[in-house]
Swiss-Prot record:
It comes from the Bacteria. It holds the Pfam family Ribosomal_S8. Signal peptide: none annotated. Keywords: Ribonucleoprotein, Ribosomal protein, RNA-binding, rRNA-binding. Belongs to the universal ribosomal protein uS8 family. Part of the 30S ribosomal subunit. Contacts proteins S5 and S12. One of its GO terms (molecular function) is structural constituent of ribosome. GO terms for biological process: translation. It comes from Haemophilus influenzae (strain ATCC 51907 / DSM 11121 / KW20 / Rd). PANTHER family: 40S RIBOSOMAL PROTEIN S15A. One of the primary rRNA binding proteins, it binds directly to 16S rRNA central domain where it helps coordinate assembly of the platform of the 30S subunit. InterPro entries: Ribosomal_uS8, Ribosomal_uS8_CS, Ribosomal_uS8_sf. GO terms for cellular component: cytosolic small ribosomal subunit. This is Small ribosomal subunit protein uS8.
């Protein structure tokens, strides 16, 4: 049986990995997953991102902790296969009053809500991270 929502699976693996104090987590790789992971790494929510080549490429994410606690307090899927959520540039949400990040898929690639607002782009809201 195929996976219905691979992005939700990725976010759940990050959440579970940090709850179990794992150093790194592995998952099947895709271009969108790598783009989301790169945004999270650039924002400082995860340590590093690596794509392991092979018959089936795997994405390895090294998780980040601060004083023994996970850096990611909450990670929540917004737009899902059954209900896509799109917002215009002036409707983009601020997560936790600007302390968190909304990951958005735009026509210019995957970026944060701040970067999308700056570029004047709207798009599909993939997830909220705080």
């Amino acid at each position: 049986m195929s996976m219905q929502d691979p992005i939700a699976d990725m976010l759940t693996r990050i959440r579970n990995g940090q709850a179990a104090n794992k150093v790194a987590i592995n998952m099947p790789s895709s271009k969108l997953k790598v783009a989301i992971a790169n945004v999270l790494a650039a924002e400082g929510y995860i340590e590093s991102v690596k794509v392991l080549e092979g018959a089936k490429p795997e994405l390895e994410i090294t998780l980040k902790y601060f004083q023994g606690k996970p850096v990611v307090e909450s990670i929540q899927r917004v737009s899902r296969p059954g209900l896509r959520i799109y917002k215009r540039k002036d409707e983009l949400p601020k997560v936790m009053g600007g302390l968190g990040v909304a990951v958005i898929s735009t026509s210019k690639g995957v970026m944060t809500d701040r970067a999308a607002r700056q570029a004047g782009l709207g798009g599909e809201i993939i997830c909220y991270v705080a």
